[in-house]
Amino acid sequence: MGTFGTESPLRLQVSSCLKTLSTSRDSGEIVHALRTLMRCLDDGEFTRIHHTHALQVLVSAQSSHWFSRSHDEDEEEMKKLWGEIIIRGPAEQTLLTLLDTISSTGESEALDRCVSALEMFLSAARLQVLLWSRCEVSGASADSPQLTETVIGHLAALPSITSNHLHTNTPDIFLPQQYYPLLAASILDTLEKTCHALRAGRDCSLGFVSQVLGKVCIQGYSSQMFETLGPRLSFVTREDALYQRVTQKLMENVPERCTESVITGLIRSLSGAAAVSRLMGNLVLTNKKAQFVLTHKLILQQYQHPTRLLKSVLGYLAVDSSRRPLLKQVLRSVCQVWCNSSAVKHTCVEQQLYVSKALLLCVALLDDSEIQELRQEMLQCMLGGVQCRLDSNVERIRRMGMVVGECLSHRLDTPGSQLKFQYGADEEIGELKSLMESLAVNDDEEEQPDASNSLQPEPKVEAPVSSQSVASDPGNGSESELDSDDDLTPYDMSADQEKKKSAPPRYVRDCLEGLMSSDDAERFELSLQVAETLLRKNVKATQEVSVQFSKVLLHLEDRYNTALFLSLRQNAMVALTVTDIKPVVDYWTTEFYALNYSLRQRLDILEVLALAAQELSEPVTNKHTGAEPITAVTPLGQSDDITHWRQIVDKRIQSKTRRISKGVTQPVKAVPNRYAPVAGFFFFPLFRSYDRPQTTFDLLGGDHLVLGRLLHTLGLLMHLAVNAPVVSQMGRALLDFVWAVRFHTDQMVRRGVMFAVCAVFLSMPSENLLTELGDDLMETRAWLADVAESDCDSDCRSLAVQSLMLMDKNLKSQLQIPDMET
């Protein structure tokens, strides 16, 4: 290059060519200028100094008409030469120029040709050339950090840059679904070239590639990248130690702010702890951010990941002896969280399940010596965690505590004191128990043999001695065969019933005495079975002994293991309530807060009140219709077939019947609501003593389960009283009660609170909302919005959203605010 004041021949030549391209309309001159620029591509000075300006002139020349006004042969040659300059030029400068031109150019032929040029650039594998040029140690030594950051940003955000300007006209290759796998394939090619260069004794740098990978992942496209990178890297690093080191170096050079997104995407794409160990090496020991992500964030702060990721992370910590101290550190942290009662109350069930899986996996990966070292901490974790979970009102949390407690006590191998619980099995419990099985961390999951095949014992071949021995038995001769009863048709005894010694009671008082008898089991069972029918048929007799009968049923115990005892008892209690409403309901609501009742009895009272109110609110139907005349005697086995053919014949008649006109549809006959006049008897007495703690019952204290059920029952009673005159007073009283417990720590109680609020907004007339609740509506709305956004329980959040929608709907209808058109 010449000194200041003099111009080099190359610069003069390039300036002449660019002037010709900008101003000339002669196709021959244009072709000659393009050929000259083609020859200059091999000159290092041209690529360093003049290529960017030349490319800008070429792109801007597209707005002129030298393509369309030339002869066909010249036009084809010009397009070919122009494409060669795009492809053979420095990839980095070409990419930046094309993207900047697309971003600054309006709709025109020039924009279309720039888009075509960028498509050509990507299809010609120029991304690989760009990345490899940055890996060579001498390739990027003179570039400024600002230029490097610009190139990385354009590489990572190419889909966003193009789609923001092209909108629906964006080519498919620019979309994330195609571009990022293409970029990932280019990274794989670059890593391959790096391995070859290192084997040849040349130095390489992976810093630029690591920054590109981190930039893409932090923008949210890690899954698209590692769908291509993960499986391929896992495969090639099994036998190639150099490739392992190159991949580990790639991960080490990822910027700290991008570490989490890169590590998470990588682990999700791999299929085993061994693959993670090959690709990451001891990154968890040398990088503090990676250590925080792997030992804390992915395990304790996030819970959306699949179980496979937990297995990979914890297996990665366990597969190498230098990383096993971190596994014990993780176990200690998980134990502290799992036995923390505050965490049980303030975290969602899904996160507690995730932490429980992590705890079981950690324990399964420890050897016996490590178990003995951590035995005391694990024992405290087991006892504290099981206790606080058994105190929960959420069934999933209780069962989770039982399963984990059993697994931990079995692993600790405490002689004579292993925990054992009774619970129903489901898929979640089966998954938790399966985590305690021995985990193979030295092989990838896809390389392990099928467990179902390897664990099955070989079938035992047994000689058919039984049939032969029977045939050769000397005791079974011809005489025994002649005397056999096998040819006789057995008598059908399926419909036989056991003959009862006692007859079922026919009067209400006899039924009551039968339930009170403690020495005759058969009489007790018969009395309980017919109790509901007798109570509903004999109204007068029932009303005479309704309170006494209610007392007997409330204290009734299943002394004889009667079939369907709970349902028969509950049905009888409901029948008493709907038959003699006021005295029985007064008895239920009074005894609910009385002393010396178990929680089960109090819950039974709430269930009976809810079922009775539901029955009273439904229309009365004639359940006992007269017997239909018998037209023919039908064998038992043919009744279903005849009914089936009757339906077919009726359908055929209906389909072939022609109707000239249809009569007026009869309106639904109005029937009185039996619940509306007595709704107050069910509802208001339940508020009588809720804030008065007793020796055996503290509703606002430790008896969270009853409080949650009470709130659900009050909400149901409120909803069934819709259109009743007393519904506004009920809504006001229920909201006052809810307001006192709206910040309760128990999830069951908060669900009941949300259910009750929904019931209020569903049942109260909209015109009464502003009148009765005007002062508290805004505060209630702010509270519901906070619950919908930040509550740890998904059901509470869902109910809060529904309550907000109902409130807004009622207020809009009352204030007559039209919906905004979108």
Curated annotation (Swiss-Prot):
GO (cellular component) term, any one: membrane
Which intervals carry biased composition (Acidic residues)? Answer: 480-489
> Which Gene3D superfamilies does the UniProt entry name for this protein?
Telomere length regulation protein 2, C-terminal domain
Q: Does the keyword Nucleus apply?
A: yes
Q: Where is this region: Disordered?
A: 442-504
Q: What InterPro entries does the database record attribute to this sequence?
A: TEL2_C_sf, TEL2_Regulation, Telomere_length_regulation_dom
For bias type Polar residues, the affected ranges are: 465-477
Q: Name one GO molecular function term.
A: telomeric DNA binding
The GO annotation for biological process reads: 'de novo' cotranslational protein folding; liver regeneration
Q: Where in the cell is it found?
A: Cytoplasm; Membrane; Nucleus
- Which UniProt keyword terms apply here? Cytoplasm, Membrane, Nucleus
Family note: Belongs to the TEL2 family.
**Per its database record, what is this protein's job?**
Regulator of the DNA damage response (DDR). Part of the TTT complex that is required to stabilize protein levels of the phosphatidylinositol 3-kinase-related protein kinase (PIKK) family proteins. Promotes assembly, stabilizes and maintains the activity of TORC complexes, which regulate cell growth and survival in response to nutrient and hormonal signals. May be involved in telomere length regulation.
Q: Which named protein is this?
A: Telomere length regulation protein TEL2 homolog
Q: Which organism is it from?
A: Danio rerio (Zebrafish)
Its ancestry begins with: Eukaryota, Metazoa, Chordata, Craniata, Vertebrata
